[in-house]
Amino acid sequence: MAEELTQTTQSITPSTGVVLLAFGKPQYYWATYNLVFSIRKHNPNVRITVLFEDTGKALSHCPEIVDYVENIGIIDAEDIYTNKKLDPGKVKINLYKYLPYDCNLYLDVDAIALKDIQPMIDELAQSGKQYISHCVGYHTIDKGRDFKEMQWAWADKMWAHFNLLESYVMPAINSSMQWIVKGSQTEAIYRTAKDLYFNNPIPIKELRMKWGGGQPDELYMNVALAIHGIDPALKTYTRNDGSEGGMIHFSMQRGLSFEKIVQNYYLQSYYGGAGFTPRFYIDWLDRMLNADFKAIGKRHIYLISRIAENKYADGKR
């Protein structure tokens, strides 16, 4: 009887873990390794799944990744490339079908964990929301065409192109972090975003900002969230230094001290193209990783400074 009860309890306990995508340049596999190492350094029990373009390719670039992940999955080639060109937005717009857990914390790999992320996961789970992302602003069409927090397209273009209601409130997300609980709501969000992305995209030449010749996933996720009336923000937070406090620190200029960042955030991002994140923070991350690897008798091989210098720029992939 006890065994049957245990099995029943396990079956209704939602699985929860971190999901990462690693494809393209070798630097993204190196970044993945640094991130999973930093997560597991602070908490070896956090579940991590990495989705690769090709396992052989990934392990040829960075064989050490397997030491720190629970599961490895493969992304279909048709979800990675468009006309034989790498298409990161396409991968992320197809993310839902690859989610391995009931509750998934998706992270872009260009970040480093500063402390145990389990309290972050717990807070996201306790919110009761099925979808949360890093939300930097909102817009309604009565505010005009300039949606300052959303760089991909002009507001009037989006409202006209997608035939949006005047009453819609559109969020602006940074999809570097997404909390996705599998269910009818999130499935509908991604279904709508995919339909817009593949069947009714804004022509690339008409975008406000170009992104390497491909379509940005955030644009279509923003529209889908507006259509479904979903607020992706974790409401307990307020804007703080350009970020929602307590999760991931994003910065284009030197601001908070290292101590304040560790105190207030779980991860430090180095997103964007080369030179986007200040070298001040890049060097700090390398110093931390160097000390952490040295403490276990290893070398910090994959320097953040080198990874950041060789990331995808807006014009090329």
Please report, for each region that a protein language model flagged, where it lies by residue.
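A glycosyltransferase accessory/donor-loop signature
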Residues: 2-16, 50, 159-317
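Active-site-proximal specificity loops/subdomain of glycosyltransferases
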Residues: 57-99
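Short internal beta-strands
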Residues: 48-54
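A conserved hydrophobic helix/loop-capping motif in glycosyltransferases and polysaccharide synthases
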Residues: 18-25
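Conserved glycosyltransferase catalytic-site signature
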Residues: 29-32, 89, 93, 175, ...
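Short loop segments at secondary-structure junctions
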Residues: 55, 99-101, 181-185
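GT-A fold catalytic core of metal-dependent nucleotide-sugar glycosyltransferases
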Residues: 90-145
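Short, acidic, metal-binding catalytic loop of nucleotide-sugar glycosyltransferases
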Residues: 38-46
